[in-house]
């Protein structure tokens, strides 16, 4: 075993409080710490929006406070090729992608990890709220102690090889404790607001942003029975279960997006939160990743999340060949969204996940 002072840990620093405290804790524990700021998005063309510059200045301030070396590394090309292109393709296909899962898989724990290793890193560390356990040479991904902040949902696509090189120093902490540690150490980012939204969009208007890259194709809105309900702005702007922005007036319960008919460019809508068209009994998933050393091949029961922060739901998983799985729900689920991640759990252990491809209804 290497001594701590001889163990180099490269921390992915975003300019936020979580990654700042990650660097602080590792430094206090005696590791050889280097901070790296990942520049994934070229925002030089975005008028009036340049949070990356501010974020890097915060990284500089914190790194100087901690007395650790820091660098900025540009991953714009990898990000465009691996994350953003995927993001656009999914929207074109009428789905609602989850770029965070892809960003973790391809950028933070691949491009960044490889770069860190080239700097002589033994490990990389991030401010994710997740925990790792090693048992007989196998790495287990465990939910973060703060149930409200647990981020294993976004880490479901990682491999044993990646996890063997990773540290999550915040995994055992509550968010409030992290803020307290930052305040006590007087870190420059102690009171900085948590970032929201997709990393490359920041706080901008999503519709406007998407229009820059994908031309909108307006079309009709209809009920499941084919009754005309007006016009939509472009299928890519809507997600299943969405209520806002439909512009359907009249009395009675609100209207929701139920489905997208890509061939006809029609948005299918239904009235009422519990409209039967919003519910499904199962789903097909693609790109299944099994975190354990051994791949699952026979059916089993476990828990699942179909969106971030959702309560765990009971399911039966039927793994298929070619990286697909059929996942049957114990209870019908509302507004399952193709393109999002389905993530599987046994107790607090995240065992893997995949991409929701299509929903299944028993009576359809």
Swiss-Prot record:
Domain of life according to the entry: Bacteria
Catalytic machinery residues: 103 (nucleophile), 199 (cysteine persulfide intermediate)
Keywords on record: ATP-binding, Cytoplasm, Disulfide bond, Nucleotide-binding, RNA-binding, Transferase, tRNA processing, tRNA-binding
Reactions catalysed, as given in the entry: S-sulfanyl-L-cysteinyl-[protein] + uridine(34) in tRNA + AH2 + ATP = 2-thiouridine(34) in tRNA + L-cysteinyl-[protein] + A + AMP + diphosphate + H(+)
Start and end residues of each stretch annotated as Interaction with tRNA: 149-151, 307-308
Top-tier EC class: transferase
Entries under CDD domains matching the protein: MnmA_TRMU-like (cd01998)
UniProt binding sites for ATP: 12-19, 38, 127
Gene Ontology BP terms: tRNA wobble position uridine thiolation
Region (Interaction with target base in tRNA), start-end ranges: 98-100
Disulfide feature: 103-199
One annotated Gene Ontology cellular component of this protein: cytoplasm
Pfam families per the UniProt record, alphabetical: tRNA_Me_trans, tRNA_Me_trans_C, tRNA_Me_trans_M
Site, Interaction with tRNA: residue positions: 128, 340
Cited InterPro entries: MnmA-like, MnmA-like_C, MnmA-like_central, MnmA-like_central_sf, Rossmann-like_a/b/a_fold
Compartment annotation: Cytoplasm
Entry's Gene Ontology molecular function annotations: ATP binding; tRNA binding; tRNA-uridine 2-sulfurtransferase activity
EC number: 2.8.1.13
NCBIfam families named in the record: PRK00143.1 (NF001138), trmU (TIGR00420)
Family assignment from sequence similarity: Belongs to the MnmA/TRMU family.
Record function comment: Catalyzes the 2-thiolation of uridine at the wobble position (U34) of tRNA, leading to the formation of s(2)U34.
Listed name of the protein: tRNA-specific 2-thiouridylase MnmA
């Amino acid at each position: 075993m290497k001594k701590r002072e001889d163990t180099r840990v490269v921390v992915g620093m975003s300019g936020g409080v979580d990654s700042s405290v990650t660097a602080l804790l590792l430094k206090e524990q005696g590791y050889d710490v280097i901070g790296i700021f990942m520049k994934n998005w070229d925002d030089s063309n975005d008028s009036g929006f340049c949070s990356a510059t501010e974020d890097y200045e915060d990284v500089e301030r914190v790194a100087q406070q901690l007395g650790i070396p820091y660098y900025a590394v540009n991953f714009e090309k990898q990000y465009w090729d691996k994350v953003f292109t995927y993001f656009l393709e999914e929207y074109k296909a009428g789905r609602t992608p989850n770029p965070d899962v892809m960003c973790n898989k391809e950028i933070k724990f691949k491009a960044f990890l490889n770069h860190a290793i080239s700097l002589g890193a033994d490990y990389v560390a991030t401010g994710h709220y997740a925990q790792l356990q090693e048992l007989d040479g196998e790495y287990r991904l465990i939910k973060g102690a703060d149930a409200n902040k647990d981020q294993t949902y976004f880490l479901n696509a990682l491999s044993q090889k990646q996890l063997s090189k990773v540290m999550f120093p915040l995994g055992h902490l509550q968010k409030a404790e992290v803020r307290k540690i930052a305040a006590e150490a007087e870190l420059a980012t102690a009171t900085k607001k948590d970032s929201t939204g997709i990393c490359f969009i920041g706080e901008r208007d999503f519709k406007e942003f998407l229009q820059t890259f994908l031309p909108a194709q307006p079309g009709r809105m209809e009920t499941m029975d084919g009754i005309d309900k007006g016009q939509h702005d472009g299928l890519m702007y809507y997600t299943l279960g969405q209520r806002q922005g439909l512009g359907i007036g009249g009395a009675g319960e609100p209207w929701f997006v139920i489905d997208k008919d890509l061939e006809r460019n029609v948005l299918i809508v239904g009235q009422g939160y519990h409209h039967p068209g919003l519910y499904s009994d199962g789903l097909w998933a693609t790109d299944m990743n099994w975190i354990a050393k051994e791949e699952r091949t026979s059916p089993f029961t476990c828990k699942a999340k179909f969106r971030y922060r959702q309560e765990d739901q009971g399911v039966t998983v039927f793994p298929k060949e070619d990286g697909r799985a059929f996942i049957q729900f114990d209870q019908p689920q509302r507004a399952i969204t193709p393109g999002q991640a389905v993530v599987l759990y046994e107790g607090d252990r995240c065992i893997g996940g995949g991409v929701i491809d299509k929903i299944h209804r028993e009576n359809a």
